[in-house]
């Protein structure tokens, strides 16, 4: 971006200067509305989420047999919700900032099949596509036991079709593993940030991995192009897919059930704050949408991004969405948080969700490494750097009197609050790699 344009952008949005300087930044969204007001802009409804829920239930018998690690849960792909009191104390000590309320961790990092939040959306979209093809071919009815999809006849049928996706790693992992198991031919277009072990794991499942020297945006674009030339190839579009988004959104009702099981209350007197790591935006956007439908105006969602890849904060704050990238303002999009290394946010997610998000913040790679180490020491839970992005959120909220006043939170409401950190990945990181992460923490 030329200097004059840049200066006028900074004049209009002074916060951009902090982003350019790679400062850890917090922006509380003044445009937040009620659910009733914000919902029409999403373009999806509660019924759409119920349909996704029903589809996953139809596939449960299949998943239980195809992936034995899901059998105990009856073929439902869901993660644990745990309290992390020792980590809460550690954060208070390190930052000299009390955290009012209770700190919890949602362990999507340990979801079965692919060990990340992408096991929600990625697997769901592959299943939705497989179901559509099988129904259209007259091989399946909605009343069938879907475990019949494991038969050689279905494998043969699906092998005529292929799936393509562009990814920094975790989405490719979930879509690759699921597609290969069903019988699709699958190609994952991986950006320069993708970890070697993720590529190796995909190849071990018979997935074709195409590697790029450039970032995520290029991998997605090339994947899209390759798919266009083949009528039997289905491209899963991380930037614009409503199906992916709905796969993530099912998490809202599931979390509500987990809260009920644990006797946790969410209402006006007991607010819920949720901190979601954000790359292109589909995962956190879909989850936040589901949470809003489940908990209404009593849940407050925040997106967390690396200082080197603040694409969603930049897009929503300036109102330019996918018309601006972090590279346009001179930021390099290079971060250890490979899952979040995205320079241009999803325009669909930004426009759909901007009224339903309470805020956005950035944190440095070093901060993620530090918290990764503390969590391993205090709670014995090991995550990848991206998954720690949400861990800084409770601090930012508890330290901001202006945010608390904007929403009229009393001291008592904050004492009764639940702070939920959404851990997005790390359950499948090889030990050697994990030890390298741990060595970087202070």
Curated annotation (Swiss-Prot):
Keywords: Lyase, Pyridoxal phosphate. It catalyses: D-serine = pyruvate + NH4(+). The modification N6-(pyridoxal phosphate)lysine is found at residue 118. Its cofactor is pyridoxal 5'-phosphate. It is an enzyme of class 4 (lyase). Disruption phenotype: Initially shown to have a 5-6 hour lag phase when grown in human urine, bacteria are initially rounded and swollen but are close to wild-type in morphology by 24 hours and to be more competitive than wild-type in mouse infection. The wild-type (wt) control was later shown to have an amber mutation in rpoS; when the dsdA gene is disrupted in a strain wt for rpoS a growth defect in human urine, lack of growth on minimal medium with D-serine and no difference in growth in a mouse infection model was seen. Single deletion, grows on D-alanine but not D-serine or D-serine plus glycerol. One of its GO terms (molecular function) is hydro-lyase activity. One of its GO terms (biological process) is D-serine catabolic process. SUPFAM superfamilies: Tryptophan synthase beta subunit-like PLP-dependent enzymes (SSF53686). Belongs to the serine/threonine dehydratase family. DsdA subfamily. E.coli CFT073, a uropathogenic strain (UPEC), was originally isolated from urine, which has a high concentration of D-serine. D-serine is toxic to bacteria. The ability to take up D-serine coupled with the activity of this enzyme may allow use of this amino acid as a carbon source in a sugar-poor environment. This is D-serine dehydratase.
